[in-house]
Amino acid sequence: MIQFTQKEIEHLRKKKNECPQAILRLEEEVKDILEEPLLIPKTGIGNWSLYYYCPDCSVKLDFNRHSPKAHRCPVCGKIWTGSPYYESWWWIVSMENYEAAFRMALLYQIAERKDCADTVSYTHL
């Protein structure tokens, strides 16, 4: 898919100097993906994020990229494990990967960040 024409890319590269905070924001949003190993499930797994809620308190569980099997409720503190929380955790990870891939593609095109292109290319394997 072609997101921008070459002319549009050149225009955006010129504009980045007028709005450096936009690039800084994109960089902050992809920081975890660039600094840590990319999380990709070995099998097709995932479930609606609507299941990532405490059934007792009806609030979204605290998401932690480093805790795929324990999911804490911010209200009652209970730790939820197993299905559907584990699968929903993977759905959230997959969405973060997707959003980060788009942002890294922008950083590559606009800020010419080759490290972002390398990471995005890896996600297509």
Give residue ranges: language-model regions.
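Extracellular glycan-targeting catalytic surfaces
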Residues: M1-L125
